Amino acid sequence: MYSASTIKYKPPRPIFLAGEFLLRTDPIIKFFVAAITFYAMATFEGPLLSIKAVNSLGHYTDWIVGHVHLGTLGWNGFLTFGMLYFIVPKLWNTELYSKKMANIHLWIGILGILFYYVSMLAAGITQGLMWRAVDANGQLVYPDFVETVIRIIPLFLFRALGGVLFLAGYVLLLYNVYKTIKQAPKELVEETVQVRISSSTPIHPERGHRKLEGMAAAFTILALIAILVGSIIEIAPTLSINKYVKTENKVEPFTPLELAGRDIYVKEGCYTCHSQMIRTIQSDGLRYGAASTIEESMYDRPFQWGSKRTGPDLARLGKKYPDLWHYMHMEDPRAVIKESIMPAYPWLITSKIDFDSLQKKVSLFNKLGVPYSDEDLSDANNRAKEQAKKIADVLKSQGVKEDVSDKKITALIAYLQALGQKGGE
């Protein structure tokens, strides 16, 4: 008989804790564990955001940006940092200059990511809830878009703090790596190390996947076929769009001047803060108008749907405001919307339109399938100048003293006033 008091139960040691000592002492292992943790978080959140109800809340908000950075900074960033801390001492045959500094980098990096992500998540959920808030009468609770911007401005400060902390950690990495290289011996001694590979499974280079890895030509051809098939699947719907759009629903293409304005819109990065895609949900319809349709983007190359709404959607902006409003808005956004956080674009008022390039642009779009007339193709420059003169005359009648008939602001106004005005269903 055994006495119960003499029996000691020792639970089995989980295999993943075999290196727990290193996890406590080695910053490199800590970086890898943190990277995998952030990867797991981002991987879980991705499918979560694919759920229709969740996506309708988070789409176009800061939440999506936070989600992307969780993987970019946490997974890619920390994995890279860990690899650098590991490989640099190996390459220079020395020890890492300061493990303590690497640990500090780890923790301020984690803190920075958490500050950034949590602030973006909170801002995104706030935006989504405010945009979709509808009262008992079926009206928007926050009809003025800028109300939703003001509410999340304090969270911008936390986001900035998170970014500063992450960058500070990166500076520590650079300094640590620099000092590690500096302390390396001047004459590097190469050592030949024999390593015995122990494996319970014998490796047969002529079997299975090992054999496939050695067939470079066959592997290249198979990869090329896969890429071509994927490309065709993506491109085919665009090339066959006419099959899906009724003739009476087709839209008019942008005029040469509007095309120039569209290029300015893209060049200045307007698409990073504004979308041009109205969703089929009640709040989007109340705020912006009818949902976007396929034909409205059929001549957009590339499309300007956007992925974030720091500012409102512009899909149906055309004719909503007079030309003077757009002029003042570009010169000084605070002149028309006091709480606006949009930057000013005063150089558009003084920079000239490159009229000479318009004919080539129109010809290129025509080759891509945009149905421009022979007159547009042969006389694009003069047609653009005529339209610009009309807009400049309207602005002059509304109080603008400068002659802007050849300025970029005129082309941009022409483009903005054309949005949602080209026909369609």
PLM regions: where:
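Post-cleavage N-terminal segment of exported redox proteins
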Residues: 186, 190-193, 197-254, 371, ...
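Long, contiguous internal "core" modules enriched in hydrophobic/ aromatic residues
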Residues: 8-22, 201-204
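Electron-transfer interface patches adjacent to heme c in soluble/periplasmic c-type cytochromes
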Residues: 223, 228, 269, 286-408
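Flexible, glycine/threonine-enriched loop-and-boundary segments that flank and lead into catalytic domains
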Residues: 20, 55-64
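Individual transmembrane alpha-helices with interfacial aromatic-anchor signatures
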Residues: 153-163, 399-408
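Hydrophobic cores of alpha-helical transmembrane segments in multi-pass integral membrane proteins
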Residues: 1-8, 27-53, 64-91, 98-148, ...
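Electrostatic cytochrome c docking/interface patches
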Residues: 242-266, 278-281, 285, 310, ...
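The canonical Cys-X-X-Cys-His
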Residues: 261, 267-276, 326, 412, ...
